[in-house]
């Protein structure tokens, strides 16, 4: 019986546990404290600090199954996914590591035992080939003398371009630092067992597949050509789970292993295509795995950084779904299949299934329309090509207008043997950046043009007034030594209680003053790592190095704090009522109200709004103490602190606790207890984009003012209705019924009146080659009635063109109707175009009916004659 992928994963860990290794869980796909990587792309990433000597390991030997993603930089497999049998965006890396414990001999023996012993993987020894670095004689001898691999199956790999240590079999972390030779184990898929080192090196037909790489970290690279021995030597190994599964399940393509076949069969059920080897099935199966795990690690689709990688993968999958005829939203429905096939690795997905599905569904809904439209334009442009090269300008237009990542466009072109002019694509991209910079000039004049490599100590968490020193003054973006009365500028201090606009919270206002000088702070913003106080000097003058008082407007700050703490309560409550799959998409905290945007596909009803308000106000009445702590980022994550973890945080973060109800990373200012908020009231709930909801709310006195205002509205309405406030609902219901009945009577009267008009205007019918043309001019007639007349005439007549004109105050409106049997050669929209072109009017519509209007009424008689001639010509063509 073949081993399942889940069993292979468990056997690997069991083997190394028996060999004294500590089993370490996979780290996140988002590398911790490593700005050099977008995503974790190897098992060793989480041990990088240990290999660099910056940190000591708690265990001398460990083993992991690491979730990895390769979609950018040196390791970018995205464009190959689906087209080859071995490439994936997401994969699992099996790895064992030694930190100054065992070295070459033991590492090789462990690998050989696991791969070849009957107890474990039981791969025939003669199916395995070995590569070693040309100068690593020690490793060669271990394979040859101890493991007994014939010398013909041990291939020495040299340096590229005669450059020392530049070899496939010499690993290095960077230009300098830990490095060392590696040995790779290959599986031979051939049945011939022919020993041919040349064929091995060329590997044109994919006969040999690398399954395990063992790196011997024994040197420290000082320069390009100089390396020295490390005191503590380490082992770093990596074996792709998908590749070893293909070997042990006796299939060549990774997409034929159990995990992918189950996924592909589920995808095929949504499509009319029966070929399970179809490239699109492979792409979608790969991409749903990567997207699920990326979102599980708190990355959301966006237009930059990790979020854009996620968006690119999603959109590539959606395009392949479209290609195989899946028109409805489908991608999010595959998440449950991924959880099912991934075994224990799928547990992290199970916890966040609803969130993953919602994020994918929203992204799919937002992109589906532009995908259809963009593909039509791309295919149209491809048809025009005569040199097999798509203009980079077109590729950029698709990216800029329809959100087509360049690799999506490249994917379509690849299928049609079309190349993209990447040079002109980059030029178009650069040009747009330049234009964008011009558009931002005003903003830059007030922010980015002031560049300071300095810091400012923020004391606003505990103080509202501070004695500060003036370090810099800017007026009109120029650094000056002083600012005088009535001048506007930006003042920078050594320390301040002013909170700078950040994290959705607006900046403080207040005053900087000393003696008879006073600077009114109207806005506070960040400039790099320092804080700028923007405003106007209202008296005296302020000079560099002056000592002054910086004093925030305490009422203004207090109102902001109420709204910020309420925002945290709202966020936690939304997750409680609507599900923890909701994701914050933006927020604004001001002194007058708060705004919170979040992803949610369904509508939110009144009862849910009331539940949200009730829970928040209960927490307010409970007068909970709000605490803040500075924690290590990993500690914060363990406490399940809510955060946008795709953001760049430092190693130490500030966490705001409202008991266990709300735990959130936040640098903003908050009230001391929830009771200070007083009252929370939602004033509006709306959709701001597909799948994005917005709630606006008020707190404290503003909430009371809002309720008073509503109360006054109700009293005013009761006066108008001449009833008590408790009877408003019943009185309104009766008035509504009465109004509807009156509207029905009006429509009946209009129909009678229209019938009389129709009898009159039918006398104006003229015939052109058997087709009726009915024209009539009305004066001060209701537009709605005209539409009813046109609809009625179209139902009663055949072979008829109707043109009704209504003149009001020297302006005209016009309705054109054409019966269906004439639409092949005469349309209402074409007639309307002729009218508005002659009168400089405006209009639009469809083939059967069109509406428009204008001011040039004098031209109407001659235009009607022109239309008659045009109709005559069209009927002649018929």
UniProtKB/Swiss-Prot annotation:
Binds 1 zinc ion per subunit. Coiled coil: none annotated. CDD domains: AlaRS_core. Its cofactor is Zn(2+). Zn(2+) binds at residues 564, 568, 666, 670. SMART domains: tRNA_SAD. Keywords: Aminoacyl-tRNA synthetase, ATP-binding, Cytoplasm, Ligase, Metal-binding, Nucleotide-binding, Protein biosynthesis, RNA-binding, tRNA-binding, Zinc. PROSITE patterns: AA_TRNA_LIGASE_II_ALA. It is found in: Cytoplasm. It comes from the Bacteria. The keyword ATP-binding applies. GO terms for molecular function: alanine-tRNA ligase activity; aminoacyl-tRNA deacylase activity; ATP binding; tRNA binding; zinc ion binding. The keyword tRNA-binding applies. Homotetramer. NCBIfam families: alaS. Belongs to the class-II aminoacyl-tRNA synthetase family. Consists of three domains; the N-terminal catalytic domain, the editing domain and the C-terminal C-Ala domain. The editing domain removes incorrectly charged amino acids, while the C-Ala domain, along with tRNA(Ala), serves as a bridge to cooperatively bring together the editing and aminoacylation centers thus stimulating deacylation of misacylated tRNAs. This is Alanine--tRNA ligase. It comes from Buchnera aphidicola subsp. Acyrthosiphon pisum (strain APS).
